[in-house]
Amino acid sequence: MIATNSEIQDGMRIDWNIPIKMDDGLVLRADIFRPIDSGRYPVILTYGPYAKGLSFQKGYPSAWERMVEEHPDVAAGSTNKYQNWEVVDPEKWVPDDYVCVRVDSRGCGYSPGFVDPFSPRETLDFANCIEWAGTQDWSNGKVGLNGVSYYGINQWQVASLQPKYLTAMCVWEGASDWYRDMTHHGGILST
């Protein structure tokens, strides 16, 4: 059994390993960072395979060092304890009254199952998470997506399902056409 807990830390209410039941019965796990005061807030949701609990500094130390060296403003104003690969820093968004939700995709991190990147099942799971986030008592029903690369590509795919509560997407470096964007730039096979 995976333990869930809630705590107030660094000016946020943090809910760890919250279960989200999928339409096929599998339970995915999410970490939720939200304002301390009760209320209904817009949600920034990410869904992906890179372990929601793995800090940027530990998982990708050379990338972290390069980022803070070249872009010190990214780390400024944050303890950086909750920085995670290619997603928003909740310490920068929660003070402006957003809820940040990070979901480990099926078979990754604390979520059971088998990894099947960019599959119809993964896209449906992502849509289920959006619908879940839009109906929570801390949500105002507006769910936005944000993320780089994998987290951007899966945004294009889930948007095709038109989840009811999806209201915004911020795609960074997310290919929407594998042929043109990834494998055949200008029609020529990229190696």
Regions found by a protein language model. Name each.
Residues 40-49, 144:
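Short beta-strand element of the alpha/beta-hydrolase
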Residues 58, 64-69, 121, 146, ...:
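A catalytic-pocket lid/entrance helix-loop region that shapes and gates access to the active site
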Residues 84-86, 95, 117-137:
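Alpha/beta-hydrolase active-site loop
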Residues 74, 90-110:
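Conserved alpha/beta-hydrolase
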Residues 2-39, 43:
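N-terminal cap/lid segment of alpha/beta-hydrolase-fold proteins
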Residues 137-150:
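Alpha/beta-hydrolase fold nucleophile elbow
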Residues 26, 43-46, 94-101:
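A fold-wide structural signal in alpha/beta-hydrolase
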Residues 51, 105-109, 175-176:
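Alpha/beta-hydrolase active-site loop signature
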